[in-house]
Amino acid sequence: MVRHNKNIMAKYLISFPSAAMVVPDGEWEAVGRDAHAVIDEAKAAGVYVFGGGIDEGVPPVLVSADGAVAEGGYPWAPPLDGGFTVLELPSHDEAVAWAARIAKACRCAQELRVFGFDPQS
């Protein structure tokens, strides 16, 4: 996998853990409205790939290379929860700007990561 290809747009993961969202009870509706508005803007701009939230009511399952299945995720890794959005953007600066918009809407910091370039995916 190539780390970056400047000739094509990169996909960026914008995410947050559930614990990052400290929202007073009366503000949840506004947060949802604002977050959906930013996602709608990303869709209208043609940069939205997909997104969602981890269903914390369904426990993870670890499937080994030999096909063995075990309840729970990696024992040494922190639990994966919260929400995420994947956007396809022409620059890191634009990714930072979208992450800032999402952070403002969600009322919490967002982690920004870039996917490595794989010409076969």
Predicted regions and their residues:
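Conserved, structured core segments of small domains
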Residues: V2-S121
